Amino acid sequence: GKRDGCKEWPMEGESLFSYKEEPLPYMPFCYKHPDYWHVIEKETKRTGDMINSRKLFDDSEKAHPITEDEIIKIEKIHGTVLLIGAEDDVLWDTAKYIRRMKQRMKEHSHTCRLDYVIYEHGTHFVFPESMLKTMLPVGSGLFVKLAFQAARKYPEECRRARLDIDQRVRNAVAKWKRVDR
């Protein structure tokens, strides 16, 4: 929908996510309606991406540093945690968040196994290649190129990342079937 000409607006004063019907703590956005959408719109136009919200998240974290309550307690997860991201993700700074979770695992005792990879190029769509082709049987590569400037500039690197992700996910699932259950 639209609200005052904006395609998206922040939920103010409430969490986007819940667990066992209880709202989870969250980092509030520093931009209110309609500035929230205008920041996204301006960055999207400036970069040539289908959508670009990274500035929104970066500015929000600068205005409200994430507290311990708002951090996902990754160390409490049982099983394997597979984190995949790309430096050129323009929706949010995935690489920074993966590094933060990796550091958290070093600082807290845990029983889970962490497997992570950060690609230089892969865009926000760091999907396994086979999954992308299932979702978009025709033109999946073209769609990613249309969506993100980085995919236009680095198409082969993005494709190689998706192929590698495909193998990593398959390996993680195969190992989970053998061991973690």
Predicted features along the sequence, with ranges:
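Conserved alpha/beta-hydrolase "acid-adjacent" motif
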Residues: 90-100, 109, 126-127
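Catalytic active-site module of serine/aspartate enzymes centered on a nucleophile-bearing elbow/loop
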Residues: 126, 130-181
